[in-house]
From Swiss-Prot:
Identification of the protein by name: Prokineticin Bv8-like peptide 2
Pfam families in UniProt: Prokineticin
Signal peptide range: 1-19
Tissue expression: Expressed by the skin glands.
GO molecular function: toxin activity
Keywords tagged on the record: Disulfide bond, G-protein coupled receptor impairing toxin, Secreted, Signal, Toxin
Primary location recorded for the protein, binned into one broad class: secreted
InterPro entries in the cross-refs: Prokineticin (IPR009523), Prokineticin_domain (IPR023569)
Family, as annotated: Belongs to the AVIT (prokineticin) family.
GO cellular component, as recorded: extracellular region
Coiled coil: none
Cell location: Secreted
Main function: Potent agonist for both PKR1/PROKR1 and PKR2/PROKR2, and inducer of a potent and long-lasting hyperalgesia. Also potentiates capsaicin-induced TRPV1 current when tested on DRG neurons. At subnanomolar concentrations, this protein both induces potent chemotaxis of macrophages and stimulates LPS-induced production of the pro-inflammatory cytokines IL-1 and IL-12. In vivo, potently stimulates the contraction of the guinea-pig gastrointestinal (GI) smooth muscle (nanomolar concentration) and rabbit aortic rings.
Amino acid sequence: MKCFAQIVVLLLVIAFSHGAVITGACDRDVQCGSGTCCAASLWSRNIRFCVPLGNNGEECHPASHKVPYNGKRLSSLCPCKSGLTCSKSGEKFQCS
């Protein structure tokens, strides 16, 4: 009986769901607004989102420093904001 109830709930969820809408999706930096870049998703490199540029103390990718970048970014991290640099801090890279 418990399994039957779970199946009914699952079918109701499927019937009333409308699918996911991805806002801020992009392919390249030029599609994003000022102060953002088009970074790859952590879950799938084929999905990209407009993400804010890194602030002081936030994690960054050392090879990803040009905005707008003409190609497709492979990193899920944006470059640092203007005036900040991406430098190694312990085990990771941070904007400073």
